[in-house]
Curated annotation (Swiss-Prot):
<dbReference type="GO" id="GO:0009432">
    <property type="term" value="P:SOS response"/>
</dbReference>
<dbReference type="InterPro" id="IPR027417">
    <property type="entry name" value="P-loop_NTPase"/>
</dbReference>
<keyword id="KW-0234">DNA repair</keyword>
<feature type="binding site">
    <location>
        <begin position="30"/>
        <end position="37"/>
    </location>
    <ligand>
        <name>ATP</name>
    </ligand>
</feature>
<dbReference type="InterPro" id="IPR042174">
    <property type="entry name" value="RecF_2"/>
</dbReference>
<dbReference type="GO" id="GO:0005524">
    <property type="term" value="F:ATP binding"/>
</dbReference>
<dbReference type="InterPro" id="IPR001238">
    <property type="entry name" value="DNA-binding_RecF"/>
</dbReference>
<dbReference type="GO" id="GO:0016887">
    <property type="term" value="F:ATP hydrolysis activity"/>
</dbReference>
<dbReference type="InterPro" id="IPR018078">
    <property type="entry name" value="DNA-binding_RecF_CS"/>
</dbReference>
<dbReference type="GO" id="GO:0006260">
    <property type="term" value="P:DNA replication"/>
</dbReference>
<dbReference type="GO" id="GO:0006302">
    <property type="term" value="P:double-strand break repair"/>
</dbReference>
<comment type="similarity">
    <text>Belongs to the RecF family.</text>
</comment>
<keyword id="KW-0227">DNA damage</keyword>
<keyword id="KW-0235">DNA replication</keyword>
<keyword id="KW-0238">DNA-binding</keyword>
<dbReference type="GO" id="GO:0003697">
    <property type="term" value="F:single-stranded DNA binding"/>
</dbReference>
<comment type="function">
    <text>The RecF protein is involved in DNA metabolism; it is required for DNA replication and normal SOS inducibility. RecF binds preferentially to single-stranded, linear DNA. It also seems to bind ATP.</text>
</comment>
Length: 364
């Protein structure tokens, strides 16, 4: 997928701005707080229907203005597609070729984003790593999103009953009905997670070897609160889940929360046998996340027949020279990339790069 033209009106610190990007590397250079990330945000919003920085439309509107709009002209699957997003406080309107659209403009992400905040996947809590499973790998299975939604709904209802059981000092009898549903959707969800990880890990490992020039080996394993093996089938997971719920029932009522299940699981990421969260340098952690982003790009290419757009916010220039060049050589001529930096401090000749200067809400 290619972005041919971007127009912003009253978006963040931009009054009125049009940008015609290049086909490959687009470098947005400028001092901090000039609007570089705002450009990436506008592209992400047009591709996905949401911002990666805020859920409040008001924050996307230029100060003292009543609305903002973004218009993007994309080339996708051999045709031109116009996406227009209009924002007023508390409301968002998305049009695709003049037709109102709810949710995702394209039906698939169309964009892969890497910001410094993504390092929390390595350094942060298990919830951050589950997000990778649920929202990055999950879309590659047709039933994953439905299963995740049903599990979360049942989990929320069950936790409410646990709170009620403690307050009323009951044994939580009605929980049995919800236990069955929790085990049904939870066992399916856990099975899908493990299956997707097993399916995709060889490609992830090979990519990581390539980006580190064979110097490092990555391992990713699934850590289940049910303590199951990776070869367990769905029925076996269900039985283990059901048994664990019975064992911890009293403790769950006391703590008013469900203590076992895929919502408590984690990924264990190691490099050369060492826990990446504890022992890897920030550069190594950044390379792990970059590996996962490149994997997503190539997997979406396999699924849809075209590459998504890549957005890199102040991360490319934090890589060492060898890893940066390995990445650019891999993506060059294939993926339309937008990257931000405070200054261009490496040789971009030969990478078909188009350089823009961003200053005070203007692009030149």
């Amino acid at each position: 997928m290619l972005l041919r033209r971007l127009e912003m009106l009253n978006f963040r610190n931009f009054a009125r701005q049009a940008v015609e990007p290049g086909l490959y590397f687009n470098v947005l250079s400028g001092r901090n707080a000039q609007g570089k990330t705002n450009i990436l945000e506008s592209i992400y919003l047009a591709c996905t229907g949401r911002s990666f920085r805020t859920a409040r439309e008001k924050e996307l509107i230029k100060r003292e203005k009543e609305f903002s709009s973004i218009r993007c002209l994309f080339e996708t699957r051999g045709r031109e597609v116009e996406v227009k997003v209009t924002l007023v406080p508390g409301r968002k309107r998305i049009e695709v070729n003049g037709v109102l659209k709810s949710g995702h403009p394209f039906g698939w992400p169309g964009v892969v984003l890497f910001t410094p905040d993504d390092l929390v996947m390595i350094k942060g809590s298990p919830a951050e790593r589950r997000r990778f499973l649920d929202y990055d790998l999950g879309p590659f299975h047709p039933h994953y999103a439905h299963c995740l939604d049903r599990y979360n709904r049942v989990l929320s209802q069950r936790n409410a009953l646990l709170r009620e059981a403690k307050e009323k000092r009951t044994t939580g009898g009605p929980l049995e009905v919800w236990d069955e549903q929790l085990c049904r959707y939870g066992s399916r969800l856990l099975f899908l997670r493990v299956s997707l990880l097993k399916k995709f890990f060889p490609a992830i490992r090979a990519l990581h070897r390539e980006l580190t020039e064979g110097a490092e080996n990555i391992e990713i394993s699934y850590l289940s609160s049910l303590k199951i093996g990776e070869e367990c089938g769905e029925d076996e997971i269900y039985e283990r889940f059901s048994g664990e719920l019975r064992l911890v029932r009293d403790e769950e009522i006391a703590r008013m929360q469900t203590l076992v299940g895929p919502h408590r699981d984690d990924l264990h990421i190691k490099v050369d046998g060492h826990d990446a969260r504890v022992y890897c340098s920030q550069g190594q952690q950044r390379t792990i996340v970059l590996t996962l982003k490149v994997f997503l790009i190539e997997q979406w290419r396999s699924e849809t027949g075209e590459y998504p757009i890549l957005l890199l916010d102040d991360v490319l220039f934090e890589l060492d020279d060898n890893r940066r060049e390995a990445l650019m050589c891999r993506l060059g001529g294939l993926v339309q990339t937008f990257l931000t930096c405070t200054r261009v401090n490496f040789d971009i000749e030969g990478f078909k790069a188009k350089v823009f200067t961003v200053s005070g809400g203007e692009v030149t």
